């Protein structure tokens, strides 16, 4: 059964907290529930350091956590450090009975640097690809075997896995039992890729979907 959730970025922005900074956590999740969503992702207003309180607030509104972003830094940090952080992330999701863990490699992302444009993104090296895919396979195996949570990789604009070619390489070099795809039609469109074609191409690896409103609008890159 397909269930629909929503990300709190529609209320508050994690990268630019001043956007929606006046909106409370309670307002955010109440409006999610009133809109009819079954679940949500996790934002910066969520009381993640008080799990009983967070669980109570979500259960009160019949919401469940469906995913939480994780910034992998397998190309930048020692694997044991990434795994330690990842396990804490997985334990949080497990507490809420979530089945999916999303995120992307951020060790070489252009995000956070306003002086670098999307067109200045540098392709990853062979060594970086090896670090990423080997690390994802191990983290995905650990996550599913120890906690029953599937690693769902989010192809993301401005990161080393952005284009269809890069997504295809990631899928080819990771184990299908350990690494799935968090499909995002908006990020494929912004990368000038065929969103529908990509969905058809990778449908057997997709276990989590991010939907974006882009139909009938001008080119994403032109708008940006």
What is each stretch, according to the model?
Residues 2-11, 40-42, 65-70, 101-103, ...:
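Hydrophobic faces of well-ordered beta-strands that scaffold small-molecule active sites
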Residues 48-63, 67-69:
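Aromatic-lined substrate-binding rim segments of carbohydrate-active enzymes
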Residues 6-10, 31-35, 67-70, 117-120, ...:
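A short alpha-helix capping/helix-coil boundary motif
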Residues 39-53, 72-84, 157-163, 185-193:
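Acidic-and-aromatic substrate-binding clefts and catalytic sites of carbohydrate-active enzymes
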Residues 1-36, 59, 87, 92, ...:
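Histidine-acidic metal/acid-base catalytic patches
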Residues 45, 106, 214:
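Flexible loop residues that form catalytic
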Residues 79-181, 190:
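Active-site acidic/histidine proton-transfer and metal-coordination neighborhood
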Residues 10-24, 43, 71-83, 121-130:
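Active-site mouth loops of central-metabolism enzymes
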